[in-house]
């Protein structure tokens, strides 16, 4: 929403509503698929053990179906925003960025969390895409301003990642996640968190 409100010159309520609900549904879909893939690890961690799938409040297949349906609805709503700026006559730029965000989050970030600390850099990309998606929904274009907004949003996530891995280190190790600076509470991670937070 912030990207839209910063980039828009003439506010369009219908466009804004499509963006809010489309973005909400695509984000929910990505989170749903993530929880389907990580259900056995979520059950091992205090922070995530009460999620619906580990608690058996919803079956895996129903969670996948629900995630697919809301993702499809989200992409449909986003595809209605400036459809004349579509890729190959199918995806609007807004829906293309929504799809890119979901794909990176589910297919790259989620599996990489158990393989390498590189995952936090990958995970910061879909975390920063919403501001880009909002800007493109407002302007149907790119530029230096949105690049700066994307970079700020990208960098602001590192204090978040570092602080969680610092506090929840034992839980992440138990579940097999390789979080950045887990168990290494020194000057370097604290300095990196501080520097990236002032941008």
Q: What feature does the model see in each segment?
A:
Residues 2-39, 47, 71-74, 95-106, ...:
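Membrane-embedded alpha-helical segments that form the functional core of polytopic membrane enzymes
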Residues 12, 124-165, 169, 186-187, ...:
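Functional transmembrane core segments of multi-pass inner-membrane proteins
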Residues 80-92, 110-118, 135-141:
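Membrane-interface helix caps and helix-loop-helix hairpins in membrane proteins
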């Amino acid at each position: 929403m912030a990207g839209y409100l910063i980039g828009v010159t003439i506010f369009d309520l219908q466009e804004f509503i499509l963006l809010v609900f489309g973005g909400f549904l695509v984000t929910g879909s990505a989170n749903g698929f993530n929880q389907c893939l990580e259900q056995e690890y979520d059950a091992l961690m205090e922070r995530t053990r009460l999620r619906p799938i580990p608690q058996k409040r919803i079956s895996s297949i129903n969670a996948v179906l629900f995630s697919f349906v809301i993702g499809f609805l989200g992409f449909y709503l986003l595809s209605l925003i400036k459809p004349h700026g579509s890729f190959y006559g199918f995806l609007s730029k807004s829906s293309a960025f929504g799809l890119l965000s979901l794909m990176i989050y589910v297919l790259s970030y989620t599996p990489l969390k158990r393989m390498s600390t590189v995952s936090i850099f990958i995970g910061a990309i879909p975390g920063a895409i919403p501001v880009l998606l909002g800007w493109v929904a407002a302007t149907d274009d790119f530029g230096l301003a949105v690049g700066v907004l994307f970079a700020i949003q990208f960098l602001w996530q590192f204090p978040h990642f570092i602080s969680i891995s610092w506090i929840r280190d034992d839980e992440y190790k138990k579940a097999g996640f390789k979080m950045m600076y887990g168990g290494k509470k020194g000057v370097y991670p604290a300095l990196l968190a501080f520097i990236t937070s002032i941008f």
